[in-house]
UniProtKB/Swiss-Prot annotation:
InterPro entries: RraA, RraA/RraA-like, RraA/RraA-like_sf, RraA_gpbac. GO terms for biological process: regulation of RNA metabolic process. PANTHER family: 4-HYDROXY-4-METHYL-2-OXOGLUTARATE ALDOLASE 3-RELATED, REGULATOR OF RIBONUCLEASE ACTIVITY A. It comes from the Bacteria. Belongs to the RraA family. This is Regulator of ribonuclease activity A. Pfam families: RraA-like. GO terms for molecular function: endoribonuclease inhibitor activity; enzyme binding. Homotrimer. Binds to both RNA-binding sites in the C-terminal region of Rne and to RhlB. GO terms for cellular component: cytoplasm. It comes from Pseudoalteromonas atlantica (strain T6c / ATCC BAA-1087). It is found in: Cytoplasm. Globally modulates RNA abundance by binding to RNase E (Rne) and regulating its endonucleolytic activity. Can modulate Rne action in a substrate-dependent manner by altering the composition of the degradosome. Modulates RNA-binding and helicase activities of the degradosome.
Length: 161
């Protein structure tokens, strides 16, 4: 489904939070949304890959990577795993790599930067915990909606039909 965050903010101004504008769309799908699964990790993609291997229909993986711009948490292999398992998208408060390949994969990927260096794969991190970045706190099972204009957060799904 396509989302227009500007229109959603107009319709649901009193019930959404707006994430500070620091994210860039790197994926093949610029607009995406759904219920979030949260991850908190730092320069380690192991827990991310494990989460993406689970069914993600209607979900968005939201990663608090500490804002690191030294190592990429998401690459084309991770995006392909997300697509294969039905995830709507990935929002990463951290970096990605292989940006030309990411553009070819039909999954949403928003991140703050790109860098060619990959993160470790030790599996260190937490899943389904509250995370805070971009001026908002994200709780597991909240809902996010993203497009090239921005990212918004709602505690409940928005009636956009």
């Amino acid at each position: 489904m396509e989302y227009n965050t500007s229109a959603l903010c107009d319709l649901f101004a009193d019930s959404v939070d707006v994430v500070e504008p620091m994210f860039v769309s790197f994926g093949g799908r610029a607009s995406f949304g759904g219920e979030i699964t949260t991850i908190k990790c730092f320069e380690d993609k192991g827990v991310i890959l494990k989460a993406l291997e689970k069914p993600g229909l209607g979900k968005v993986l939201l990663i608090d990577g500490g804002g690191s711009m030294r190592r990429a948490l998401i690459d084309s292999a991770a995006a392909q795993i997300a697509l294969d398992n039905g995830w709507e998208g990935i929002i990463c408060y951290g970096s990605v790599r292989e940006v030309d390949d990411l553009e070819e994969i039909n999954v949403g990927v928003h991140a703050i930067a790109s860098i060619p260096v990959s993160a470790d794969d030790q599996g260190v991190g937490e899943v389904d915990v509250a995370v805070n970045f971009g001026g908002v706190t994200f709780l597991p099972e909240d809902h996010v909606y993203a497009d090239r204009t921005g990212i918004i957060l709602s505690p409940e799904p928005l009636d956009v039909e």
